[in-house]
Amino acid sequence: MKTTDIKLVHTDTLSCEPIVRRMSDGSLIMVSQCGDTYEPAPNNRVYFFHSYDDGESWSTPTLLYPEDGNAVYCTEVALYGGRVKAYLTLHNGQFFDWRSMVMCSDDCGHTWTCEGAFAGLESYAFIRGKLELKNGDILLPFQRYPVSEYENLRLLAEFGGVRRPDGRVLAVCDVPDINIDHVDNGVMLSRDGGKSFEKFSCPRFPIRGETGLKWIWSEPTLAELSDGRIAMLIRVKNETLWRSESCDGGKTWSAFKPADIPNPSCKPKLIGLPDGRTALIHSANSQKRNPLCLWISDDDMKSWKTREVISDFPLNFDYPDGFYENGKLYISIELQRRDVLFIKYSL
């Protein structure tokens, strides 16, 4: 019998992109951006929560990155044996002066130390959900915006602290004359368990100019298919997800094409299942982030025969993440950018 168990982890003035993972001691950790009333904003910070009863109850929020005046965002929490790494973004509150930062924990996420910037993706980049391939290779998908240091300084000088008519700070995606014309998506590939990485990029995804795209938050997610191919999905705009594939373990990628998967410009999450099927957690709607859906493919993402609604509660479900374990999906999600939810959904 299918069951859906939904628990409230935390409510804040803003909650954004919670990420749940199983720790080596059996506990669960949830990491989420919280604080301020929108994002990006100067008072965005990243907190963690623990659960020792499989998600029935959660600890109070604890700051993950030590306070230094920077706005902070987290885009991935990855396990490497008993070590946990949180991939953070530090910025001025507008995604200017945007720098990567890796935080590491060897005690299941209770204390954290700073490892510095992620080599090769030091600035204007998000690191996304880790995928370990059947051969042991590790892939970290990324999105990167080719903003030079000169352009970064110009943005700070001209637009730092500038506010929009609605009172919110002007974000990097709002700048009309930013000097970039594409977004880089790709993977960081490790063959030594995550000790070192090499960067491999997809064909550039053009923005601005004749594309009609002012900016995209691509937020790539990966799945390994039955024949060893790797599929990547990205969000582009309110219509459909886009797809690229690699046939050589992530070194080269096909050009992105529409995937015929409706999406309201919201992060999707692919999860490989032990039986070879591929699960996709997303909002299967081209206009709004509702309902929260689970699609499952048994033919390497050619079709999605299983299409289920996890919840159609009439508010926005934003930025799903999670993992599979013992017949259930462990899902983290934000509701209406305020509530951090934890969901156990049986398959």
Model features per residue range: what roles?
Residues 1-347:
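Asp-box/BNR beta-propeller blade signature and adjacent active/binding-site loops
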